[in-house]
Every structure is written in C-alpha cells, then in structure tokens.
Design a protein with these regions (language model features):
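Transmembrane alpha-helical core residues of multi-pass small-molecule transporters
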Residues: 12, 407, 531, 582-586
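Transmembrane alpha-helical segments that form the functional core of multipass membrane systems
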Residues: 365-438, 447, 453-457, 477, ...
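Conserved catalytic motifs of ABC-family nucleotide-binding domains
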Residues: 479-533
C-alpha cells in the first residue's frame, strides 16, 4: 500500500468518526428538546386545570360574583354617575304622536324619532294593491345622537345620548299642539331634556313640521371645556316609486348654507358621495324624488360632515344617509332649537315652510326645478298655471293637454317667425344654388359668404331668423322637462292606460332586460318616438330644400334621435312622455296649417319689393364696417393661399 492510499484511508476514517460523534450529539439534544416540550405541555395543562377549578369555585360562590358585579357597577358610577348608569339599564318605551298628516313614533332609547308615516301618500304597488302608507324613517336604521363631554374625577367622559334610555314625561295637548318631553338625568339636579312639538292646527307652514327643542338644565358646572356639541343623524330610506333608476336620479343629500339663495347637494348618482364643510350650515335634508326629511337649526350648525351610500336595486331601499353636525357651545349655552320636516316635495307646501326663527329658509329649492332661468320659468309660469288648472279640472291628463296647448299658443309668434324664415330661404334657393355654382372653390368661400349676406339683406331675411326663435323658447321647453319628473301632483294620478303619471307606463313586461332600455315597454314613450319620426321627417322635408347642408343629416334627424329617445325615456315619467307626444302632434298640426296658408308666391312678391327698396337705401356704418372686415379677411385668405403655393 503506497503512502497516498494510507493517507486517504486515514482521512476517510477520521471524517466518519467525526460524523458519528456529531449526529450522536444532535440526537441527544433533540431528545432533550422533546422532554422539555412535554414538560411545558404538562405544566400548561395543570395550570389550565387549576384555573378551571378556580372558576368553578367562583361560580359556586355567589357572594364573590355579587362582589365582582358590585365593583364593576361602582366603577361605572364613579365614571359616569348614578343617573347615566341607571339610564343605560332602563327599559325603553314606545310613544306615538299623530295629526292629520303625520304619525310619528318615538322610542325613549336615545329619545329619538323611530318611524314617520305619511297619511296622504302610499307606496307604489300594482293597481288595486296600493294601500301601504309612505314611511320615511326605517325603524331599524333611524339614529340620532348628541355627543358631549362631562368632567368626572379630573377626567373628561364622553356621553352619547343614543346609548341611554330617557325618562318620558308623557304627551301633553293644548293650544293646537302636542308636546312630548323626555329627560336624561346626568347628575343630581342636572339633566338633558328633549321636547318634540307636533301641531294639530292646519297650517301650511307646520303641517309636516315638528319643533325639536333641547334644554340643558344644571349641566354647566359639570360640562367639560368644549367648543361644540356633536349631533349625528342617520337613516335608510325606502324605495317608494316604481322605478329604482328613475327615483335614484332625484335622490340625494341636500343642504343649505346661511344667506345663500340656492341649495347644494352631494350629486344624484349611484355609489357613494360625501362632503365635509367647515362652514356653517342652515339645514340638512335626506331628499328622495317626492319626499324629504330635513333637520333645521335655528342658529345654524357649526359644521357638517355628510355622506350617502346607494343601496342595491331590488333591496327595497334607496340610500343610506349620515350627517354629523356640530352646535356651538359655551358655558352659558342653555340649549338649542331645531325643526324637523318630514313630508312631500310639494312646492305649495315647501314654499310656506319657515325656520325655528320664523325666517324663510328656501325649502322649496329642494325641488330640482332647474337653474336660475329654467327655475324661474317653473316657479313663476308653469307651477302657477298648473295649480290654476287643478282647481277646475280633475284629470291630470287633460291638464297636461291644456298646458301644452297654452305653451304652443305662447310660443306661436316665434314658431311662425321661424317658419316664415324657412319659407323665405326656400324661395331664394335658386339664387343660393347659383352662388354655390359661381364660387365652388374653398378660397372663394369668403366672397361667397359676402354675396350670400347681400342676398339675405336684399330679400329681408335674417340669418338667425330660423334658429333664434327656437333658442328663445328652449328655456320654457326645458322647464317643462324638469317639472314633470319631480311634480308630486302627478303621483298616483292615472290617465288612460297609465296607472301613475309620475312613473313609466308598462304595457308589456319583458322576460329579459335589454341593455340601456329595460325590461318593459312604455307605450307613451313608444308613441312619442313614432310621432318624433313623423315630425322629424316632416321638418326635414321643409328645411332640406332651403338648406342643402341638411341633406346629409337625414339619418340623424329622422331615425337616430328618435331611437336614442326611445332608450332614454323608457324609464321616464309617463306624464313627460305624454307631454312630448301631444307637443309634437300639435307642432305638426301647426306646421301643416302654416304650410297650407302661407303663399310662397306672395312671399316672393314681398321679397322683390324689399330688393327694390334696398337698392336705394344707403348703407349703414355697421354694414360698411362689416363689408370692410369681410374684404380684409378675404385678402388674408388669399395671402395664405399664395404662401402655401410658394412652399410647394
């Protein structure tokens, strides 16, 4: 055996011996670890057994349990006081106040309104089954809380009134009102008092209102230093109308800032929305399409943190609302005065509502009647006429028909002027065609425009004569578009096959849903679109001959727009679709009548006379400046054309 072989055998033997020693030690350590784990498990088991025996002994000893409960009770008393501890353990009661318009149910748990039922309005249901009254507060989610801090043993303790059961002093009646008083004792001789007042005497300003007064009695010495008292008001509203989509379009959280002439809101969208205001807020309202709940402060809220969350379609609910407000507080504060509105979004009612101080708080602006111009038309023209007709006519379908006729009569001078302008354009069409043939090139567009304007002037035609009258009447037409979907007067009013003019009329329920259209067929919407096709085709025939550029828009005017309206309006108010149907039929009748009685030859004769007069008429300074401007623009275009040609 050579030297290298001997060295290799020795090294291998040494490595094997070291490996055996190392693994033996690891095995020994592992066994020791297992013994340690087993010992710890046995110790834990014995401790748990001992603890269980101690618990059994404590349960077997009622004196020890009572002592523990007494000690816990004393800790609560030391922290909150005897009055609040007793209030938390008290059994809640239910109380009810009622007048001809509202039934209001209260609970002494937090001394809050739990349910409000409207006597005159019912929830949508199929014909013959509509008997469920509108409920504005959901008892499961209605919540009101006042939060403030007390001084207790050198500590500030937070008090949330919703956690405590108030003591009811009962309901008293007299002087045309009912008063419910509930109190929460905070300390001996110190308490918070809630007073709710519901009026029996009929008064448009108070029919749907409650006064809500908060009084702090003897609290000032034990109140901690704080600048505001917090208020939290939340609720979940029911779906009351036929269409979730249509109702949601007008359901939002609204609020008004002091001294403002308009109302703000969080938007009328699905999903969630929120807003935090560090400025004062006059009132906050949980608004639906036709009903609202509003919380109004006499001295304004110091701030407002508001939000809503849209519920799922088919859940039976619309939105969850939450509003956290603050009221300014000083040691001299003796309480606060509020008003609570629970009622319809009816202009005649809301316009009479005043705040706790008797001031106008613009509650009627809750109804989305449009911006300043459109809203003005609705408030001062549409609504007064509508209310006047209601006094003498029972059928709202007939009222809409008469209102449409009145609108057409009102705008007839503008319609006639627009038609006359179109007729004049039709008469001078040969001259216009000659100008188009004379100046076919793009660089001559300015010169063609000049001669076209001269032709209009000689013929006595205003370039805006056709569209300006239509623009003037747009605010009124848009006002009616905004009025019908939010008019509670149409709610529950049937007409022909429609059960409710405030909702869509379904003559056929589909077993499936068509995207952007829905799962039903609205007959008023369908008839509106059919008449729109007829009206658009008739209007196209009238304008295409006088305006060649309209020829390429036939598909859009005659077919595309009515098809789009069919999808848009299938879920809209049947009253609105009925109005557009009647409006288009009347417009076609008027246009056919004017077409029959307006003589093109007579118009041509008058235009020839105007041309003769224009020849001898001196040009005005404005016309001279306009012609000079046109010449300068034409020269600029020629220079640009030359520059482009030079670059090539």
């Amino acid at each position: 055996m050579d030297k290298k072989t001997i060295i290799g055998v020795v090294l291998m033997s040494a490595i094997f011996i070291v490996y055996m020693v190392f693994t033996s030690r690891q095995q020994t350590q592992y066994q020791e670890y297992l013994k340690q784990v087993q010992a710890e498990e046995q110790l834990l088991e014995s401790e748990q057994k001992a603890q269980a025996e101690q618990n059994n002994e404590a349960e077997a000893d009622p004196v020890s349990a009572e002592d523990a409960a007494a000690a816990a009770h004393q800790r609560q008393v030391d922290m909150f006081g005897e009055g609040l501890v007793a209030a938390k353990a008290r059994q809640a009661e239910q109380l009810t106040m009622q007048n001809d318009y509202l039934t209001v149910e209260f609970t002494t748990q937090g001394a809050m309104m739990q349910k409000v039922t409207l006597a005159e309005y019912t929830k949508f249901a199929p014909k013959g089954e509509r008997n469920q009254k509108i409920v504005l507060f959901d008892p499961e989610s209605a919540y009101f809380d006042m939060e403030f801090y007390l001084k207790r043993n050198l500590k500030n303790v937070k008090v949330n009134t919703s956690e405590y059961v108030f003591t009811s002093k009962g309901i008293t009646r007299g002087e045309g009102k009912q008063t419910l008083t509930m109190a929460l004792e905070v300390s001996e001789g110190a308490y918070v008092e809630y007073e709710y007042v519901l009026y029996d005497e009929k008064n448009p300003a108070r029919d749907y209102m409650l006064d809500f007064n908060v009084k702090f009695v003897g609290l000032s010495p034990i109140m901690a230093q704080q600048s505001t008292v917090g208020l939290t008001w939340s609720n979940r509203t029911y779906q009351n109308e036929r269409s979730f989509k249509a109702e949601n379009m007008y359901t939002t959280l609204s609020y008004r800032l002091p001294e403002e002439d308009d109302v703000e809101d969080l938007g009328m969208s699905e999903g969630e929305a929120s807003e935090q205001l560090q400025s004062e807020v006059n009132w906050v309202a949980f608004r639906q399409q036709f009903f609202s709940q509003a919380f109004i402060a006499a001295d304004n809220f110091a701030y407002g943190d508001m939000k809503f969350n849209t519920m799922e379609s088919g859940s039976g609910y619309m939105k969850e609302y939450s509003a956290r407000m603050g009221m300014n507080y000083t040691p001299q504060t003796e309480g606060y005065r509020f008003s609570i509105y629970c009622g319809p979004n009816k202009y005649a009612v809301l316009s009479n509502v005043v705040g706790p101080n008797g001031d106008d708080i613009l509650m009627e602006r809750l109804i989305p009647l449009g911006g300043w111009l459109v809203g003005w038309f609705n408030r001062w023209i549409v609504i007064p006429v509508f209310d006047f007709l209601r006094q003498y006519i029972a059928s709202f379908g007939i009222i809409i028909l008469i209102l449409t006729i009145l609108v057409k009569l009102l705008i007839f001078p503008l319609t006639y002027k627009s038609y006359l302008s179109t007729a004049k354009m039709r008469v001078i069409k040969p001259e216009m065609d000659a100008l188009n043939a004379k100046y076919p090139r793009q660089e001559d567009a300015m010169k063609k425009q000049q001669e076209m304007m001269a032709l209009y002037k000689k013929a006595g035609i205003s370039p805006m004569g056709g569209c300006l009258p239509m623009l003037i009447q747009l605010p009124l037409l848009w006002a009616l578009f905004r009025f019908f979907p939010v008019s509670i007067e149409l709610r529950e009013q049937p007409f022909l096959w429609a059960d409710d003019l405030s909702s869509y009329d379904s003559v056929l329920n589909l077993p499936f849903s068509i995207p952007f259209y829905g799962d039903h067929v609205s007959l008023f919407c369908l008839l509106m679109c059919v008449t729109m096709i007829g009206f658009s085709y008739f209007n196209y025939q009238q304008t295409s001959s006088s305006a060649p550029q309209m020829a390429g828009m036939k598909f859009m005017m005659v077919y595309m727009m009515p098809a789009m309206m069919l999808f848009w309006f299938n879920d809209y108010s049947s009253g609105l679709c009925y109005y557009y149907l009647v409006s288009q039929v009347l417009t076609m009748v008027i246009m056919m009548g004017m077409r029959r009685f307006v003589d093109d030859d007579k118009i041509r004769y008058i235009m020839e006379q105007n041309k003769a007069k224009q020849k001898n008429k001196k040009k005005s300074k404005f016309q001279l400046r306009y012609e000079e401007l046109m010449r300068q623009q034409e020269e600029m275009m020629r220079q640009q054309q030359k520059q482009k040609a030079g670059k090539r």
